[in-house]
């Protein structure tokens, strides 16, 4: 795919001649959507980039709001970590390229220019990580501008379950390397960063995995399309994908419960990123110090967002991370 000259959004393009206060900061209590309870044998499902059968809605999942206190990590960024919370804050990412070096509307440009820096940042942040494989990226924008980006995900979710993580390893690493890598520690980690920070609109909230119980996470099914929904144009394709291919995997939908602790990083900038851990195989080991190993997360609307604030424009890079420990 050849890079194009399509314009990309900037803060100035959305906030011309507007003097804005700093982004909202501090703890905030605000509604977050959680999936409704399903009674077996019914289960929640969602079709993504994959037309459902005639007469079938693309999803049967309905969100129900709960008032959640989201704690601000600004000034205490090191108070969370991957082993306990499945969340880590990265700062000082001056070596991660941005516009105009990266054309965000070109998959080829993102893969060649942005991916290597993300892989290096993750290896630096996660001790013992020897292999990082990016299997997709997704760009989100609150106004769907200038190309059809996805909007922020406004419902709490967990992108993959443990079995889905195993399937991802086998799918993307192949029949030889995949089983070998599954003998060590394997994880799915999202690298999330704004493309026009600081973020004012729809920041991301993440629940500490140590505070979310397994029985508070419902298991739903996502039906993903082939090229359009699973690997392209969201990221790196598998070898010779079939455009008609369909792929299904389990994902998690949490219930809100007392005792959960939710966090966000106010005014996150382009030299910062969040590592959001979706799965860590070490959490399954007896006497493991990893607590939960999976972070449910959601965008949320901050009622303190000032009028005329810039839209949120961000990228989420999904990575398989392998280590020997």
Curated annotation (Swiss-Prot):
Similarity field: Belongs to the asaB hydroxylase/desaturase family.
Protein name as annotated: Hydroxylase/desaturase poxK
Region (Disordered): 1-25
Compositional bias per record (Low complexity), positions renumbered to this chain: 1-12
Root EC class: oxidoreductase
Lineage: Eukaryota, Fungi, Dikarya, Ascomycota, Pezizomycotina
Pathway in which the depicted protein is active: Secondary metabolite biosynthesis
Source species of the chain: Penicillium oxalicum
GO molecular function: oxidoreductase activity
InterPro entries: AsaB-like
